[in-house]
Amino acid sequence: MSEQLLTASTPIDAAPLSDNTVQTTAPATSKINLLDLNRQQMREFFAEMGEKPFRADQVMKWMYHYCYDDFEQMTDINKGLRAKLQRVAEIRAPEVAEEQRSVDGTIKWAIKVGDQQVETVYIPEADRATLCVSSQVGCALECKFCSTAQQGFNRNLRVSEIIGQVWRAAKIIGSLKSTGTRPITNVVMMGMGEPLLNLNNVVPAMDIMMDDFGFGLSKRRVTLSTSGVVPALDKLGDMIDVALAISLHAPTDDIRDEIVPINRKYNIEMFLAAVRRYLDKSKANGGRVTVEYVMLDHINDSTEQAHQLAECLKDTPCKINLIPWNPFPGAPYGRSSNSRVDRFSKVLMEYGFTTIVRKTRGDDIDAACGQLAGEVIDRTKRTLKKKMAGEPIAIKTV
């Protein structure tokens, strides 16, 4: 596949795991939104109109290579087909409700999805530009250190609302090309939500990201991050091959049970076994997974816990990203000191692990890891009950 640059809370037990249902929120119009269709579906739609497959490919190229949303701009499409498309289809990406720019070049967009918002973040670096994309409105997993989780869960995003974030960002960044703004080179499913709880919408969206007539990214440049929905991770390996990152954040089950509650259902051993099964199928990961580990002061950052983490990961080929925790109002944690992060990192490197301390980006606009919140109508009964009862969060220190 050729690669191009992009220029132009439901309780855990109630959340869908292996049987992911496509989001069925009614669109605003009866026209088919072509952003909801991957290439196979586009060809089927065009066949129903009596058109050949290459016509679908032509339209996809205009949609994603040039970020066009007006059929009249597609000059190699005959007028009859353009008129037909105007009657039955549309290209409708989510709109930007608000934009914030960080001093470090990071851009955060609040993206309108129906009557709510999700957040999408553009992160430029010297050799790449990464787009962080949301998969759900809110999140069901209730990770205690994450701002999104505190909002509760509302709904899954449609394919058009996921790929539409990439489309909208690529269009904006394309308009800034003259200013030297770097085109998007990587996409990470690390925004709001747990991607594996929305597989039937996330997978087609990632398929479009990697399609030559879509955004044309290589599978090594599209990364899905998960907190450990084991049945869905096994299913993912049969559906698509992308780079994988795992939100581990603890070396032992007792700590992870508290800060990543899904661990009570799928513990670390089960999670890492599923990761190894995925790596056995995948060519996108170079044989190893990225382990994400947020550093919480005196919670999971002792040298003893670094040794425990090394032991825990000894059978799982990986590189480790240590992530300074990014605070949000009301959070019961503190960020690990540089000295504690340093000691933790050195222990892991002594065991031979490639270990990187992630540089915090966009924290002045609340765009850093764990700070995305959007605007969510909280429909999670359990979360609401906790808020009403003022239930404290139990924390262990080390």
From Swiss-Prot:
<feature type="active site" description="S-methylcysteine intermediate">
    <location>
        <position position="369"/>
    </location>
</feature>
<keyword id="KW-0949">S-adenosyl-L-methionine</keyword>
<feature type="domain" description="Radical SAM core">
    <location>
        <begin position="125"/>
        <end position="364"/>
    </location>
</feature>
<feature type="disulfide bond" description="(transient)">
    <location>
        <begin position="132"/>
        <end position="369"/>
    </location>
</feature>
<dbReference type="GO" id="GO:0051539">
    <property type="term" value="F:4 iron, 4 sulfur cluster binding"/>
</dbReference>
<keyword id="KW-0004">4Fe-4S</keyword>
<feature type="binding site">
    <location>
        <begin position="247"/>
        <end position="249"/>
    </location>
    <ligand>
        <name>S-adenosyl-L-methionine</name>
    </ligand>
</feature>
<feature type="binding site">
    <location>
        <begin position="193"/>
        <end position="194"/>
    </location>
    <ligand>
        <name>S-adenosyl-L-methionine</name>
    </ligand>
</feature>
<dbReference type="GO" id="GO:0046872">
    <property type="term" value="F:metal ion binding"/>
</dbReference>
<keyword id="KW-0963">Cytoplasm</keyword>
<keyword id="KW-0489">Methyltransferase</keyword>
<keyword id="KW-0808">Transferase</keyword>
<keyword id="KW-0819">tRNA processing</keyword>
<keyword id="KW-0698">rRNA processing</keyword>
<keyword id="KW-1015">Disulfide bond</keyword>
<dbReference type="GO" id="GO:0000049">
    <property type="term" value="F:tRNA binding"/>
</dbReference>
<dbReference type="InterPro" id="IPR040072">
    <property type="entry name" value="Methyltransferase_A"/>
</dbReference>
<dbReference type="InterPro" id="IPR048641">
    <property type="entry name" value="RlmN_N"/>
</dbReference>
<feature type="binding site">
    <location>
        <position position="143"/>
    </location>
    <ligand>
        <name>[4Fe-4S] cluster</name>
    </ligand>
</feature>
<dbReference type="GO" id="GO:0030488">
    <property type="term" value="P:tRNA methylation"/>
</dbReference>
<keyword id="KW-0411">Iron-sulfur</keyword>
<dbReference type="InterPro" id="IPR013785">
    <property type="entry name" value="Aldolase_TIM"/>
</dbReference>
<feature type="binding site">
    <location>
        <position position="225"/>
    </location>
    <ligand>
        <name>S-adenosyl-L-methionine</name>
    </ligand>
</feature>
<dbReference type="GO" id="GO:0019843">
    <property type="term" value="F:rRNA binding"/>
</dbReference>
<protein>
    <recommendedName>
        <fullName>Dual-specificity RNA methyltransferase RlmN</fullName>
        <ecNumber>2.1.1.192</ecNumber>
    </recommendedName>
</protein>
<dbReference type="InterPro" id="IPR007197">
    <property type="entry name" value="rSAM"/>
</dbReference>
<feature type="binding site">
    <location>
        <position position="139"/>
    </location>
    <ligand>
        <name>[4Fe-4S] cluster</name>
    </ligand>
</feature>
<dbReference type="Pfam" id="PF04055">
    <property type="entry name" value="Radical_SAM"/>
</dbReference>
<feature type="active site" description="Proton acceptor">
    <location>
        <position position="119"/>
    </location>
</feature>
<dbReference type="InterPro" id="IPR027492">
    <property type="entry name" value="RNA_MTrfase_RlmN"/>
</dbReference>
<dbReference type="GO" id="GO:0070040">
    <property type="term" value="F:rRNA (adenine(2503)-C2-)-methyltransferase activity"/>
</dbReference>
<comment type="similarity">
    <text>Belongs to the radical SAM superfamily. RlmN family.</text>
</comment>
<dbReference type="GO" id="GO:0070475">
    <property type="term" value="P:rRNA base methylation"/>
</dbReference>
<comment type="function">
    <text>Specifically methylates position 2 of adenine 2503 in 23S rRNA and position 2 of adenine 37 in tRNAs. m2A2503 modification seems to play a crucial role in the proofreading step occurring at the peptidyl transferase center and thus would serve to optimize ribosomal fidelity.</text>
</comment>
<dbReference type="InterPro" id="IPR004383">
    <property type="entry name" value="rRNA_lsu_MTrfase_RlmN/Cfr"/>
</dbReference>
<dbReference type="Pfam" id="PF21016">
    <property type="entry name" value="RlmN_N"/>
</dbReference>
<keyword id="KW-0479">Metal-binding</keyword>
<keyword id="KW-0408">Iron</keyword>
<feature type="binding site">
    <location>
        <position position="146"/>
    </location>
    <ligand>
        <name>[4Fe-4S] cluster</name>
    </ligand>
</feature>
<feature type="binding site">
    <location>
        <position position="326"/>
    </location>
    <ligand>
        <name>S-adenosyl-L-methionine</name>
    </ligand>
</feature>
<dbReference type="GO" id="GO:0005737">
    <property type="term" value="C:cytoplasm"/>
</dbReference>
<dbReference type="GO" id="GO:0002935">
    <property type="term" value="F:tRNA (adenine(37)-C2)-methyltransferase activity"/>
</dbReference>
